[in-house]
Amino acid sequence: MSNPKVFFDMAIAGNPAGRIVMELYADTTPRTAENFRALCTGEKGVGRSGKPLHYKGSTFHRVIPNFMCQGGDFTAGNGTGAESIYGAKFADENFIKRHTGPGILSMANAGAGTNGSQFFICTEKTEWLDGKHVVFGKVIEGMNVVRDIEKVGSGSGKTSRPVTIADCGQLS
């Protein structure tokens, strides 16, 4: 079975910015990949928070140039919230894959075993995150869109313009 491919159709300041296509490593991180895939399709309905378990309409709330672009907080929208398809949080699956360079897709967390829905896309090699954050996919198309998102970031992570996932889903 091949790894699933999902997409984000991005908007910057309300304007279409292009599509990011990601391959999810279901072969090495099946639970983490399934969580992200289902949050892209929205197929699990409404979560415990009362919000849809869906990335559509959520933002990239933290973007740091030459580091990463972080999103996935569809409960609070500011980096304080997150919910997985398994409940509030789930354990680190494994650290087989590494943060080897631009385009790596990894889970954001607040310490061991605190994965929810927040994720980040690396814009550089970030080896200091190995063993702390679960790598579960990579960008296979649209890295130029990630670079455009990176341009509205700052050292603090605050974006100069809103970066939104206008639509998302599964391709294969």
UniProtKB/Swiss-Prot annotation:
Any one GO MF annotation of this record: cyclosporin A binding
Keyword ATP-binding: no
Modulation of this protein's activity: Binds cyclosporin A (CsA). CsA mediates some of its effects via an inhibitory action on PPIase.
Top-level lineage group: Eukaryota
EC code(s) of this entry: 5.2.1.8
Cysteine pairs bridged by disulfides in the record: none
Cellular localization per UniProt: Cytoplasm
A GO BP entry: protein folding
The family this protein is said to belong to: Belongs to the cyclophilin-type PPIase family.
Described purpose of this protein according to its UniProt entry: PPIases accelerate the folding of proteins. It catalyzes the cis-trans isomerization of proline imidic peptide bonds in oligopeptides.
Protein name, per record: Peptidyl-prolyl cis-trans isomerase
